[in-house]
Regions:
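Exposed, flexible binding/inhibitory loops of compact, secreted disulfide-stabilized domains
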Residues: 3-11, 21-141
Length: 141
């Protein structure tokens, strides 16, 4: 009888050890609730340092998100990976202060059906400049 209760207690304890971390993740999910708007500028990648341009070049084949801080400004870079043709662009829908960090909302926009595209692959990305922040940057895309 003692052996059965020991096995049952072990199973229950194992289930709790597995489920509690899952519950805690669900309880602390990031909130994208807007607190205030933020000023931002979409910048030409050519104004970035050679170091950052090299980091983008290394990552742009796959989708990526990164931030770079130079003291005065934070640069948020979102790339959508390699696309089969040219003609893609990226819309920056919103950049705002949320309850738990800075939120960035972007969308990849494909070429219009009537638009002439080249068969050459492209790797669209956007660089967003905001005043320097010491907060987590989160992405909605």
């Amino acid at each position: 009888m003692k052996g059965i209760w020991g096995k049952i207690a072990g199973i229950v304890l194992g289930m709790l050890c597995f489920c509690i971390p899952l519950w805690s993740c669900a309880m602390f999910e990031a909130s994208d609730k807007k607190v205030s708007d933020m000023d931002f500028t979409v910048v030409n990648p050519e104004v970035l340092s050679e170091e950052i341009r090299k980091m983008i070049e290394e990552r742009k084949k796959d989708a990526f998100q990164m931030a770079y801080h130079d003291g005065s400004y934070s640069y948020i870079i979102v790339g959508y990976g390699q696309q089969e043709t040219s003609g893609y662009s990226i819309a920056v829908n919103d950049v705002y202060q949320g309850e738990d960090g800075i939120w960035v909302d972007t969308d990849l926009i494909g070429p219009e059906k009537s638009e002439k595209t080249e068969a050459a692959a492209s790797s669209p990305f956007v660089v967003i400049k905001i005043e320097s922040v010491d907060q987590t940057i989160r992405f909605k895309n």
